[in-house]
Amino acid sequence: MKLLSVLALSATASSVLGASIPVDTRAEKFLIELAPGETRWVTEEEKWALKESGQDFFDITDEEVGFTAAVAQPAVAYPTSIRHADAVNAMIATLSKENMQRDLTKLSSFHNRYYKSDYGKQSATWLQQQVQAAITASGANRYGAKVASFQHNFAQHSIIATIPGRSAEIVVVGAHQDSINGRSPMTGRAPGADDNGSGSVTILEALRGVLQDQTIVQGKAANTIEFHWYAGEEAGLLGSQAIFANYKQTGKKVKGMLNQDMTGYVKGMLDKGLKESFGIITDNVNANLTKFIRMVITKYCQIPTIDTRCGYACSDHASANRNGFPSAMVAESPIDLLDPHLHTDSDNISYLSFDHMIQHAKLVVGFVTELAK
């Protein structure tokens, strides 16, 4: 139970008993994990201060009593060769930078997408409508494809699109949908174009591409496919933690999860004299899944890779990993060259490359198809 709930009960009792019981007016506190086994109780303001200092964390306040984080990498076999090049290339040919620019213009127009705000709720509702439209336009809904809200104890909901396959084993692609202004989290302007509007519209356009394949649309792929848009990532990976904890509790099988968090900024690399590249995260990920992703990139994308590390609890793939599911992350660049405008009111479309975002969309289409079909 959160301290806030305790305070609410105390306040009720105080009014009933004529204020004979003192009310604790201390700020609500949250239990965070900064490294395996390293926990701390902090206020909301202290959470944001840690975030702005570059310290990521899991918010585990609502974690089930007795939860044990996974410590071993799941033993999962992945394809060692490309098997669906014709199908993937046909899907890739349908990907549209114009769609991505249109969607990101709208998504970044909300005042912010803060997980506790009405704006965060409104943006999630709009995004879910776009996902539903893509499913309906493809006809996949006639074969069981659907999109659903995953509700939390805050305003913004997560979104899960499901395309059934012949087995219940799931291939997941995810991106967080929320945004934050580091100086004024509650009310500040936070367009979040790159962090993480870019990842959100990247996987949305990849979903449209995947839904061009009739084998997948008609539920004939070997595995089930899910696209996730997570709420509350900035506050401690809240949405993805809740989803993957639920999957663990209900015995779901996840073959692999690919996270897309920030997919549009290349200037940092170019200013350093580097080639435009993907940033392949190598820590807190599944090594075999990452090896498979490298193969997909080599086949379907036109830019190279650079290995990089992002630390503990840096993004939503860490939630999958913590719950025992194999996960990986590919970022827009090495972590030290990410978009410097993140968490500010200047995180705008004008700094982004839609050519680079298309490369990420190609990766997602290739990943999903080669692993699920």
From Swiss-Prot:
Cofactor note: Binds 2 Zn(2+) ions per subunit.
CDD domains noted in UniProt: M28_AAP
Residues carrying sugar: N196, N288, N348
Residues holding Zn(2+) 1: H176, D195, D261
Main location: secreted
GO molecular function terms attached to this record: aminopeptidase activity; metal ion binding; metalloexopeptidase activity
EC number: 3.4.11.-
Keyword Zinc in annotation: yes
Single GO biological process annotation from the record: proteolysis
Keywords: Aminopeptidase, Disulfide bond, Glycoprotein, Hydrolase, Metal-binding, Protease, Secreted, Signal, Zinc, Zymogen
SUPFAM superfamilies from the UniProt entry: Zn-dependent exopeptidases (SSF53187)
Domain of life: Eukaryota
Compartments, as annotated in UniProt: Secreted
Signal peptide (UniProt feature, chain positions): 1-18
Disulfide bonds: C310-C314
Gene3D superfamilies: Zn peptidases
Propiece span(s): 19-75
Entry's Gene Ontology cellular component terms: extracellular region
Subunit structure, as described in the record: Monomer.
Stated role: Extracellular aminopeptidase that allows assimilation of proteinaceous substrates.
Record's protein name: Leucine aminopeptidase 1
Species this protein is from: Arthroderma gypseum (strain ATCC MYA-4604 / CBS 118893)
